[in-house]
Amino acid sequence: MLPALWVSKTGLAAQDTNLTTISNNLANVSTTGFKKDRAEFQDLLYQIKRQPGAQSTQDSELPTGLQVGTGVRIVGTQKNFTAGSLQTTDQPLDMAINGRGFFQIMQPDGTISYTRDGTFHLDSDGQLVTANGLALEPAIVVPADAQTFTVGTDGTVSITTAGNAATQVIGNLQTADFINPAGLQSIGNNLFLETASSGAPNVGTPGLNGFGTTLQNTLENSNVSTVEELVNMITTQRAYEMNSKVISTADQMLQFVTQNL
């Protein structure tokens, strides 16, 4: 088999994965707090037929040698944690982090997951939960007689009750940050898990020590740019077509050899 067939096959596979990444970004263009991915390419091993710098004669050496590439692969996907635009809403339970940090969400097994999606609701006990019913950590429980619900930029949660105009603090939000957010593991439902690559979470008060502030009646939009993704999609399509063309050309060359030799 011509080596070009294998090389082109790796190109098709890599561009297919790249297109899948782009399509996932576009599919989540309206997902609150979504962070786009970028596929990272890496060339495969080379066949060293003539070593660069090897002696060609007693008094001369090869300036470049002969190195034949064997293709390409997707080595990873890089999560881009640049902030999305902020959208004002009329829901007091909607929150966003303006700057670095993640909301902490308690999983059913007791582990902590992390999210930039601040779309919260109240469950039957008055506890702040995600759309899937997972509790915010630290737990915030809103009394049934609460008339107003306020979240400060420092994460202080306060309410007022009927017949009492005095503000009552019922809890404090704490956010988490990571040395390498791109190393977090995506598990769906807008949630991430800590990994060895992300490092241990640094938990703190919003607005202090580099943590972003919390904004009420606000949601963070996806950071996907449709224009940028469409340009990437066209580039990927062209690369896929060119690799397909190489396979067609190599096939024609093989047919010529079998028919004429």
Protein language model regions, located:
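Amphipathic alpha-helical polymerization modules
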Residues: 1-261
